[in-house]
From Swiss-Prot:
Pfam families found in the cross-reference section: mRNA_cap_C, mRNA_cap_enzyme
GO CC field: mRNA capping enzyme complex
Taxon lineage: Eukaryota, Fungi, Dikarya, Ascomycota, Saccharomycotina
CDD domains per the UniProt record, alphabetical: Adenylation_mRNA_capping
Subunit structure comment from the entry: Heterodimer. The mRNA-capping enzyme is composed of two separate chains alpha and beta, respectively a mRNA guanylyltransferase and an mRNA 5'-triphosphate monophosphatase.
Top EC class for this record: transferase
Protein name (database record): mRNA-capping enzyme subunit alpha
Length: 463
């Protein structure tokens, strides 16, 4: 079994009536025609060989590590009645969880006291929850790694390019959060976890990002390529958002159905209902099902403590179909039984053994209600057969950088010929070296010392 279990979503799951109201708030916040029935976050597509030429060489891209955690959006809004700030996490099943203890201020306009007087309202952030090892304390901690922003204080950003959204996320959301922790740590004692921003490097630095994966304080299973100048795709697949994984990390989420051996007790009368019974002492067969769309046979794992009845299997086959068999060793079966948890009908993440073609169990994915859709499975299989190796990407780095410089030069030429005269703008600081196993944390967003502030020369480091 794999030890990379996704963290549980913290907070209090909200009832249907509250969830409906929150969905409507997001609908208005993003200027959507109607509330989304599914998770409003964008979804990446698997990287293929054709994407090198058609995407990485054709337009500017950021690259960052792909965190193996739990994807979640964070919504921060003010309650118009109580005037209190509410913070909610939204998981991939579009469930909403209330988080108590946070306080997110706005960016001060005059002085730092505004950090205690203002509150974010109408902000929607995209990120990943992960359990990681704190480099300083060596303790395991929950952290939210942010990588995009859909709205900031009531202003929708989904039509803005990625570069602009990241700038708003850093300056208008993360910086005041950092400053509050730095200047008023006592006001942050109730925060349920810490927040960080992911490093976004230029695509031609992909080799350095890949080389840093083993140095990160959490598990990372690949790379994410995000186009610099594209808008945010709400609630669907984004063909420009690419996820690359090493061949061994290309996995599929299945619904696992157990076929328990049936034993006949011929000492009992033929009409005795106990004459046939399930033998739970013998290792069962494990069938992997892929989702074809539509509602599941059931929505709660605790309903799957017993084998499916004939009627339940008939209902299941309306939305799922058998795809493969899962090979479970006697040792794995012993570990599964020792969990003393329901197994039948759970979602499991599996990897394909390239030598034998067999599917191997990695971990349970209780954060997912359904397994991967048949279309997703097909894409993953294509990605496996058309596997893009890291060496293939590294070989293209000189061309990627050359194309980047060509586009940069054309923009400069165009602006000098047709653009209006603009005042000089300070050059953007280069991104942090990707070989450093850190995130945009704390000191990256600190202001220069104020002349009239004695303690500003020694601002607290708050890793």
């Amino acid at each position: 079994m794999d030890s990379r279990d996704a963290p549980e979503v913290p907070g209090i799951r909200q009832p249907a009536n509250v969830t409906t109201d929150l969905k409507m708030i997001i609908c208005k916040l993003l200027n959507s025609p109607k509330p989304a029935k599914t998770f409003p976050g964008s979804q990446p597509v698997s990287f293929q060989h054709v994407d090198i030429e058609e995407k990485l060489l054709a337009q500017d891209y950021y690259v960052c590590e792909k965190t193996d955690g739990l994807r979640a959006l964070m919504l921060i809004i003010m309650n118009p009645v109580t005037k209190e700030q509410g913070c909610f996490l939204i998981d991939r099943e579009n469930n909403y969880y209330l988080l108590n203890g946070f306080r997110f201020p706005r960016l001060p306009r005059a002085n730092r006291k505004e950090l205690l007087e203002t509150l974010q309202d109408g902000t929607l952030v995209d990120g990943e929850l992960v359990v990681q090892t704190n480099p300083a304390t060596r303790l395991r901690e929950l952290r939210y790694l942010m990588f995009d922003c859909l709205a900031i204080n009531g202003r929708a950003l989904v039509q803005s390019p990625t570069s602009s959204r990241l700038a708003h996320l850093g300056k208008e959301f993360y910086k005041p959060y950092y400053d509050l922790r730095a200047y008023y740590p006592d006001r942050c004692a109730t925060f349920p976890f810490k927040l960080s921003m992911k490093h976004m490097n230029f695509s031609f630095d992909l080799d350095r990002v890949a080389g840093s994966l083993d140095k990160l304080p959490h598990v990372s299973d690949g790379l994410i390529f995000t186009a610099v100048d594209t808008p945010y795709t709400v609630g669907g697949k984004d063909s420009t958002l690419l996820k690359w994984k090493p061949e061994q990390e290309n996995t599929v989420d299945f619904k696992m159905i157990l076929e328990i051996p049936v034993v006949e007790d011929d000492t009992l009368p033929k009409k005795d209902r106990n004459r046939f019974y399930y033998n739970f002492d013998v290792k069962p067969s494990f069938h992997l099902y892929i989702w074809q769309g539509g509602p599941d046979v059931n929505t709660r794992l605790h309903d799957f403590e017993q084998p499916f009845s004939k009627k339940e299997l008939e209902i299941l086959h309306r939305t799922y179909k058998v795809f493969a068999e899962l090979q479970i060793s006697d040792e794995q079966w012993a570990k599964m039984k020792a969990l003393e948890q329901p197994l039948n009908g759970r979602i499991v993440e599996c990897a394909k053994d390239q030598e034998t073609g067999e599917w191997k169990f990695l971990r349970f994915r209780d954060d997912k209600l359904n397994g991967n859709h048949v279309s997703v499975v097909q894409k993953v299989l294509e990605s496996i057969s058309d596997s893009v190796k890291l060496e293939d990407l590294e070989h293209m780095i000189p061309r990627i950088k050359a194309r980047w410089e060509e586009r940069k030069s054309k923009k400069r030429t165009h602006s000098s010929i047709s653009g209006p005269m603009l005042p000089p703008v300070a050059e953007t600081k280069a991104p942090r070296e990707a070989t450093q196993s850190r995130y945009i944390d704390d000191e990256d967003w600190s202001d220069e010392a104020d002349d009239d502030d004695e303690d500003s020369l020694k601002r607290a480091r708050i890793e």
